[in-house]
């Protein structure tokens, strides 16, 4: 019987030349691997992607990130090689790919990147004990159910702000350069450590729910004949 690979997290982030994962291309990818206790293992990975000649960047994205097509043309890998490097990191057995808003954005960037370069866009998400997770939803869950131990900032509208840079500033977490992929990854790991330290049971419960089987198990506890409350947070 094949041994189960040890769990590790690949905390990662993209900076892109636009906000549409289907159309816009990645400019930068950064990742840090940690063990299950959030201790860093290995060296950080940071890559630039050489822009395609027929893909126009959004000027606003370049202004936000400070990453220009010229910089990526000089330092970047061809997209096929960039995609292979990203896929190899995420596909390592036992890896949980995780970021901040990664389910809605970064994972979609990865899927379209792999598809364009003739690589399986889904295998690294489930094969070999792998999975994916999103710390943004964990932060929202902690705010709603177990807010103690974390400072929750508010935006100009008076509502809770879950922007990574706001949470990092409110909690004294290092975040040297918002919209730099490696800086965003380090801030995400720091926030994960804070939530895990403050609310370990909630953290572990949310982590378990990355599995469809665990979600199905939770739902199977609900009996239609009996009134049951089911809370959805997103």
Which role fits each region the language model picked out?
Residues 7-8, 23-29, 33-35, 39-67, ...:
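Metal-dependent phosphoesterase core characteristic of DEDDh/y 3'-5' exonuclease domains
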């Amino acid at each position: 019987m094949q041994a189960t690979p040890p769990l590790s997290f690949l905390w990662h982030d993209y900076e892109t030349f636009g906000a549409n994962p289907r159309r816009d291309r990645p400019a930068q990818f950064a990742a840090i691997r940690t063990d299950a206790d959030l201790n860093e293992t290995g060296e950080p990975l940071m890559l630039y992607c050489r822009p395609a000649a027929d893909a126009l960047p959004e000027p606003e994205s370049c202004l936000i990130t400070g990453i220009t097509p010229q910089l990526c043309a000089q330092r970047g890998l061809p997209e096929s090689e960039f995609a292979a490097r990203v896929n190899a990191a995420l596909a390592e057995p036992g890896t949980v790919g995780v970021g901040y808003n990664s389910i809605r954005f970064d994972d979609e960037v990865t899927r379209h990147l792999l598809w364009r370069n003739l690589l399986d866009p889904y295998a690294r998400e489930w094969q070999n004990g792998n999975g994916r997770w999103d710390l943004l939803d964990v932060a929202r869950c902690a705010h709603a159910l177990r807010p103690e131990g974390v400072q929750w900032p508010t935006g100009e509208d008076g509502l809770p702000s879950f922007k990574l840079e706001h949470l990092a500033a409110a909690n004294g977490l290092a975040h040297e350069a918002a919209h730099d992929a490696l800086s965003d990854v380090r801030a995400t790991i720091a926030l994960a450590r804070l939530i895990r330290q403050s609310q370990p049971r909630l953290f572990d419960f949310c982590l378990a729910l990355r599995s469809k089987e665990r979600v199905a198990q939770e739902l199977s506890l609900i009996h239609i004949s009996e009134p049951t409350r089911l809370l959805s947070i997103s």
